[in-house]
Amino acid sequence: MRLPIFLDTDPGIDDAVAIAAAIFTPELDLQLMTTVAGNVSVEKTTRNALQLLHFWNVDIPLAQGAAVPLVRAPRDAASVHGESGMAGYDFVEHNRKPLGIPAFLAIRDALMRAPEPVTLVAIGPLTNIALLLSQCPECKPYIRRLVIMGGSAGRGNCTPNAEFNIAADPEAASCVFRSGIEIVMCGLDVTNQAILTPDYLATLPELNRTGKMLHALFSHYRSGSMQSGLRMHDLCAIAWLVRPELFTLKPCFVAVETQGEFTSGTTVVDIDGCLGKPANVKVALDLNVKGFQQWVAEVLALVP
C-alpha cells in the first residue's frame, strides 16, 4: 500500500532531489504539490517545480502558494541556490500552469476529498501550512502527520541559532508547532549529516538523464561542494517516510522564538524536559549516514 503524500516545496536545488524521490519512490504516492516563497520567490519556485514535472513527464497537480511570510519581510537563499533557484541546467520550454487557487485551499480541497488521512511533507518555509491550519481548521482530522525539513536543536545555518526554513517565517512555524497535529522534524541535526560524497556525485552523469541534470545543478549548489560532498537537507524528510529506521527521534517540546533580537526563528528544542511542557514534536537527532547514502543511490537509480 503506497503512502499518500502532499509535498509543499520551494525549489531549490536540494528540493529537486527530494521531489524526484517523492515521485519515484515506490512506497510513496505523491498526489499534490504546492510551492512557497523561500529559496527564491514563489514565482521562481513555481516555475522550477513545473519544469521538474515536465522534465519527468509526470502529471501531478501543482498550486502556487504564499509569496511573502505571514507578517515580516521576505528573505531568500539565492546565495545557496542561484538567482533562479535551480541554476546550472537549461530546462526545455513548456506550457504547464499551476492550479487556479492558492496552495492552502488546494491542500484543503484535496484533504477533504481524500479517502484517508494524508501525510503532509513541508520542505520550505511553513507559510502555506500555517494558512491551512489557521484558515481551515476543519482539515486537521484529515492530516495524518506533518513531516518537515526545518529547525535545529543546536546551531543554525542563516543565524547562529536559526535554520532558514523556520527563520524565513517564524510566525508561521510557531502557528504550526502549536497546532496539535503530529509533527516529525528533520532539522539540521540530521540534514547536516546527509552528505552525498564526491565519489558518488561523480557517478551521476553516467547514471541516467536525471543524474546528468542533478550533476549540473549540483555544480551551482553552495551547501557544501562537489569536492567535499553536498548536504541533502530536504531529502531527509522523504527518507524518513520510507526508511524511518535510519533516524533517531526523540519526542520533545518545541517552540519557535519570534521576538528575540538575535534569536528570532530559533526552534527551542527542550531535549531534557527543562520546561516541563508536553512533547509536541518528534525531533530527529541522529542519522545512519551510510544507510541514507545507500537509500539515495537506490532511489536515484529508479528515476528516469
UniProtKB/Swiss-Prot annotation:
Q: Which GO terms describe its cellular component?
A: cytosol
Active-site residue numbers: 233
For this protein, the record's InterPro entries field holds: I/U_nuclsd_hydro_CS, Inosine/uridine_hydrolase_dom, IUNH, Nucleosid_hydro_RihC_nonspecif, Ribo_hydro-like
Alphabetized CDD domains for the sequence: nuc_hydro_IU_UC_XIUA (cd02651)
Domain of life, source organism? Bacteria
| Keywords linked to the UniProt accession | Glycosidase, Hydrolase
Q: So what EC number does this one have?
A: 3.2.-.-
**Gene3D superfamilies cross-referenced by the UniProt entry:** Ribonucleoside hydrolase-like
Q: Which SUPFAM superfamilies match?
A: Nucleoside hydrolase
**Any single biological process term in GO:** purine nucleobase metabolic process
EC supergroup of this enzyme: hydrolase
Q: Name one GO molecular function term.
A: uridine nucleosidase activity
Q: Does the keyword Hydrolase apply?
A: yes
Q: Matching Pfam families, A to Z?
A: IU_nuc_hydro (PF01156)
Q: Which family does it belong to?
A: Belongs to the IUNH family. RihC subfamily.
Q: What does this protein do?
A: Hydrolyzes both purine and pyrimidine ribonucleosides with a broad-substrate specificity.
What is the protein's given name? Answer: Non-specific ribonucleoside hydrolase RihC
